[in-house]
């Protein structure tokens, strides 16, 4: 199996290889987006290679085991797969695992990189039989590129234009059978025609603290970092249900253990290290607290619109919606309503404030 990453220039993004809304200066210790290319390289080293090594996402894992096994048994291309959910939950990892389990090559790119039909055509025509094409941020495909993709997904054919002007003509090219794995944090932004062409759709959920503790212990073993069960759980419970964050916090706690301790990670040492990093026991950092405080203090608990929150705390609306909000909502500290965001009773208690309407009690 081989893996290819197609850049078509500067990683498809602005300087530094990051999309504008995820530039390194916008990221936090507990952001689910990768901080740097160096971190991406470290993630690859810690990434599980097969489904049996993959922790969590039991429903998606079971489905993929069955569908991959059936495709392998029939020597066919796996049906096209859509993976969606918040960032950092393992969509890219699963794409690599799918290719490895099928024993085929993986070609990797992202939606913003595919600016022109010829970019996609170059990828598709170089795929071998049953290969996997992984498109991250597939919701950001341009309409003209998406149109080219439809016949490729349905009939393994593409139409390309030869020549220019009056002499231009369209020719049909046959493709090898292949599997498209699309990943997105915003499934609602996919067009219906594209969404309907995926035969396998898997939603990735936030991980439990117990699942993340298993991931932390596995990663610590690969990093040769001694850690006990309580130390692993302390890191896991502050990781916002996200493996990428758990691995990042583990690496920083390991640094702390090497300099301020004897190299071993215990619960007490992890607590000191994470307090230094401003990650509280709930897994919140200063941005989470700023958001909750803004909703409670500046907007009387809500409801308040996303744009108003963004302006209030100096953060982009997309970052709030994709990175900060999901965990706060999942943990019951924030509510989305038709009229806007509202702070819950848990948010007031977390900030040490009296809950409105609790005066009588």
UniProtKB/Swiss-Prot annotation:
BP GO terms, sorted: DNA recombination; DNA repair
Superkingdom assignment: Bacteria
UniProt xrefs under CDD domains: AAA
Any GO molecular function: four-way junction DNA binding
TM region positions: none
UniProtKB keywords: ATP-binding, Cytoplasm, DNA damage, DNA recombination, DNA repair, DNA-binding, Hydrolase, Nucleotide-binding
Ligand binding (Mg(2+)): 92
Localisation: Cytoplasm
Record-linked SMART domains: AAA
Region (Disordered): 1-25
Enzyme Commission number, as recorded: 3.6.4.-
Region (Head domain (RuvB-H)): 281-361
Region (Small ATPAse domain (RuvB-S)): 208-278
Record-listed ATP binding positions: 46-47, 88, 91-93, 154-156, 197, 207, 244
InterPro entries in the record: AAA+_ATPase (IPR003593), AAA_lid_4 (IPR041445), DNA_helicase_Holl-junc_RuvB (IPR004605), P-loop_NTPase (IPR027417), RuvB-like_N (IPR008824), RuvB_C (IPR008823), WH-like_DNA-bd_sf (IPR036388), WH_DNA-bd_sf (IPR036390)
Pfam families: AAA_lid_4, RuvB_C, RuvB_N
Residues the entry annotates as binding DNA: 336, 341
Physiological role: The RuvA-RuvB-RuvC complex processes Holliday junction (HJ) DNA during genetic recombination and DNA repair, while the RuvA-RuvB complex plays an important role in the rescue of blocked DNA replication forks via replication fork reversal (RFR). RuvA specifically binds to HJ cruciform DNA, conferring on it an open structure. The RuvB hexamer acts as an ATP-dependent pump, pulling dsDNA into and through the RuvAB complex. RuvB forms 2 homohexamers on either side of HJ DNA bound by 1 or 2 RuvA tetramers; 4 subunits per hexamer contact DNA at a time.
UniProt remark on domains: Has 3 domains, the large (RuvB-L) and small ATPase (RuvB-S) domains and the C-terminal head (RuvB-H) domain. The head domain binds DNA, while the ATPase domains jointly bind ATP, ADP or are empty depending on the state of the subunit in the translocation cycle. During a single DNA translocation step the structure of each domain remains the same, but their relative positions change.
Family classification: Belongs to the RuvB family.
Protein name: Holliday junction branch migration complex subunit RuvB
């Amino acid at each position: 199996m081989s893996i290819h990453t197609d850049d078509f220039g500067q990683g498809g993004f602005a300087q530094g290889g990051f999309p504008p809304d995820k530039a390194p200066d916008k990221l936090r210790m507990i952001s689910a987006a990768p901080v740097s290319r160096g971190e991406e390289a470290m993630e690859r080293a810690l990434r599980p290679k097969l489904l049996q090594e993959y922790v969590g996402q039991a429903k998606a894992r079971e489905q993929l085991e069955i569908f991959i096994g059936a495709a392998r048994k029939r020597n066919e291309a796996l049906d096209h797969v859509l993976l969606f959910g918040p960032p950092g939950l393992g969509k890219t990892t699963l794409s690599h695992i799918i290719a490895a389990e099928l024993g085929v090559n993986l070609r990797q790119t992202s939606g913003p990189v595919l600016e022109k039909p010829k970019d996609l055509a170059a990828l598709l025509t170089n795929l071998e039989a049953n290969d996997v094409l992984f498109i991250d941020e597939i919701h950001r495909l341009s309409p003209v590129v998406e149109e080219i993709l439809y016949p490729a997904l349905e009939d393994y054919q593409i139409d390309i234009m030869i020549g220019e002007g009056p002499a231009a003509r369209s020719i049909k090219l046959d493709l090898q059978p292949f599997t498209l794995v699309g990943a997105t944090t915003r499934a609602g932004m996919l067009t219906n025609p594209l969404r309907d062409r995926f035969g396998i759709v898997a939603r990735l959920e936030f991980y439990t603290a117990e699942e993340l503790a298993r991931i932390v212990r596995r990663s610590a073993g690969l990093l040769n970092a001694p850690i006990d069960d309580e130390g692993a759980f302390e890191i896991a419970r502050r990781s916002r249900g996200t493996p990428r964050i758990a691995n990042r916090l583990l690496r920083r706690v390991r640094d702390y253990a090497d300099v301020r301790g004897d190299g071993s990670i215990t619960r007490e040492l992890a607590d000191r290290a994470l307090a230094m990093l401003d990650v509280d026991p709930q897994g919140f950092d200063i941005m989470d607290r700023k958001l909750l405080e803004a909703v409670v203090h500046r907007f009387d608990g809500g409801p308040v619109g996303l744009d108003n929150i963004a302006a209030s705390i100096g953060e982009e609306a997309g970052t709030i919606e994709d990175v900060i909000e999901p965990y706060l909502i999942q943990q019951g500290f924030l509510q989305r309503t038709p009229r806007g965001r509202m702070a819950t009773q848990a948010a007031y208690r977390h900030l040490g404030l009296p809950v409105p309407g609790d005066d009588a009690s």
